[in-house]
């Protein structure tokens, strides 16, 4: 008699679940996935598509998207061999984790953090060392360093600015961790364009154990294009490239990236709008009874309410979709809402006042 197919699978699958988005992905006012509220203008889309039409669709793209990598390297002011492009930063996370994590390897993750970190560590049979954030959801840098040294961790993942908590480490704090800890450090800078803190990309040549992760899904408004990057020194890059899926990024992504970077004022204008709205929303939310708002360094806000499940449902019924993040450590009865257009934010405020 044959074994049940489950007995033939990776046993780690019993400890993880498929990714899902509570409430779906469609709503009149969609504020649940930290996307930009601004799509690319039609004139730029037309220009991108005109270029893509001239590409051969019957041929594979490059093994790695070398033209996109060179474009982004030039934008950052780093050598092309220090950059690798992926089909979204999630794919890059899979690649980096496969290169850095294995059975028995210790992975330090401040909690709460992006849920995919834990999932990948478990899937690759790593041992997670959790370090809680402070009660105000800021990083406890001393605790991170102490745990890394005590547990002799191999890999440290820092979401800074943090998703879902919304706060950042300073440039000096990240450098302190990288310089002190005997581990590879991944700094996930998905929200860096919204942050008051400086990127640590400038440290990649100084520290051979640092990797920086970037996404084009947030500030650059390209979530539908799936474009991510890792930046590190060439020696480490040669190693993390080994498990990378070949042909994963097509020419459309490369062409889109080049055109958006050539018209970067679209990004800076959108970021200024979002930051101004974030400041207004912080003030407005602070005036609503029963709502506690946390300081943010991203394009989203964390609020604590009396009953997150009930408020989430009432907002959903009112046409506004946010993210219930109550399941994360330290975030009981918390909701996450990204900054939308003025009218979308006003709709959220109106509903919260009636909850």
Curated annotation (Swiss-Prot):
The protein's annotated pathway: Amino-acid biosynthesis; L-histidine biosynthesis; L-histidine from 5-phospho-alpha-D-ribose 1-diphosphate: step 7/9
Keywords of the record: Amino-acid biosynthesis, Aminotransferase, Histidine biosynthesis, Pyridoxal phosphate, Transferase
Gene3D superfamilies, per the entry: Aspartate Aminotransferase, domain 1, Type I PLP-dependent aspartate aminotransferase-like (Major domain)
Entry annotated with the keyword Ion transport: no
Enzyme Commission number: 2.6.1.9
Enzyme class per UniProt: transferase
Catalytic activity: L-histidinol phosphate + 2-oxoglutarate = 3-(imidazol-4-yl)-2-oxopropyl phosphate + L-glutamate
Residues with the N6-(pyridoxal phosphate)lysine modification: 218
Gene Ontology biological-process annotations: L-histidine biosynthetic process
Cofactor(s), by name: pyridoxal 5'-phosphate
GO MF annotations, alphabetized: histidinol-phosphate transaminase activity; pyridoxal phosphate binding
Domain of life of the native organism: Bacteria
Quaternary state and interactors: Homodimer.
The protein's name: Histidinol-phosphate aminotransferase
Taxon lineage: Bacteria, Pseudomonadati, Chlorobiota, Chlorobiia, Chlorobiales
Gene: hisC
